[in-house]
Amino acid sequence: MHHLTKLTMLQKDKSAAIGFIFITMLIDITGWGIIIPVIPKLIEELIHGDISEAAKIGGWLTFAYAITQFVFAPVIGNLSDKFGRRPIILISLFGFSLDYILLAFSPTIVWLFIGRIIAGVTGASITTASAYIADVSTAENRAKNFGLIGAAFGLGFIIGPVIGGLLGQYGSRVPFYAAAVLCMVNFLYGFFILPESLKKENRRPFDWRRANPVGAILGLRKYPTLIGLIAAIFLLYVGSHAVQSNWSFFTIYQFNWDERMIGISLGIIGLLVGVVQGGLVRFINPRLGNEKSVYIGLALYTIGMLLFAFATESWMMFVFLIPYCLGGIAGPALQSVVASKVEPSEQGEIQGTLTSLMSASSIIGPPTMANTFYFFTHDDAPFKFAGAPFILGGVLMLLSTVVAYFSLRKHRA
């Protein structure tokens, strides 16, 4: 009886911990979401150029953030395996506050790059949050709990861009002040509320070989059976940048949207992502199984991308979001398969590696998509076709489906 009570209390503690990490992620993503609708306008102001040029700079800004995150994510992941998740998450949140303050006061485009580099160094909250979730999950509820990170993204993107779009009407820098305040609130919340998830006996010494970003990817050689799945995840990440990096610039160019409209549309994307990742994943994935979830999700992503490419009216973008966002069942399913193949003491490392891959995809994806957009929209373009990045994204999603198919078939054999 006493053992049962203890078990119930332990489960309650784990549920509370997942609740805490969900709120921390939610506030983090909301701060990030707030600045998205105004980035195009701020870049245009600082470079005195048009939206086509601003898109190209926007791609390189994301590249600067991603390349620093790529270098530092495995370092941070391994530090969290040694010192625990809590201190690392708190340092990350503090770094983001500093980034937003720098962006708010930036007199030149160089300042934007410096701010993004600082955020890249400390932007490990997702790595550490993923490891945190792995710490407090069982094999049965791991996919469901990873889905909660997606739901925090979704909710943060409902609240953030809508606030950012509305605040952006008072000036392109106002949302940055709001994001900085929000990040400091999150830091304080984490400081007083967030419990540690990594038990002392599950910690391990810091190792520079494991903390090397290229080493983190080469470390995958330990898991040869996972290479195909990781490649499918990588292609999925790169392809999704057709939407992530392009949405604001595409809709400004194609439909002349303002910050408010961009904010509302991103809020709707967030709502749909939240419904899919926080709700549907819990029902669909266990019923379909991870394998079918991967195929159906990737097919829906591909269809959504191709529809965006040929949209001619604003309302079409909203309708086409439905198949695209339903594709979100693929990510947690792939992540769940990968996480189930490694030991508890290695979750921090494998999540750090996945974040490194996400960052590597952000090194390739945004400049590729932004330059594709620029190539087909600038004044001397061979022919004008703003939807070109979506076509490229759709092709990458198709490739991801093929790679996932062969890899999962091998796992069955």
Where are these regions (language model features)?
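Cytoplasmic helix-loop-helix junction between adjacent transmembrane helices
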Residues: 115-154
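Helix-breaking motifs and short loop linkers at transmembrane-helix boundaries and internal kinks
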Residues: 84, 105-107, 122, 256, ...
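Juxtamembrane intracellular "pre-TM" segments in multi-pass secondary transporters
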Residues: 4-15, 195-231, 253-254
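Conserved MFS/SLC helix-loop-helix module at the cytosolic interface between two early adjacent transmembrane helices
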Residues: 70-109
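C-terminal transmembrane helical hairpin of 12-TM major facilitator-type secondary transporters
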Residues: 291-334
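Helix-to-loop junctions at the C-terminal end of transmembrane segments
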Residues: 71-84, 276-290, 373
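A membrane-interface helix-boundary motif in multi-pass transporters
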Residues: 168-181, 371-397
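Short amphipathic helix-loop junctions that connect adjacent transmembrane helices
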Residues: 38-55, 245-262
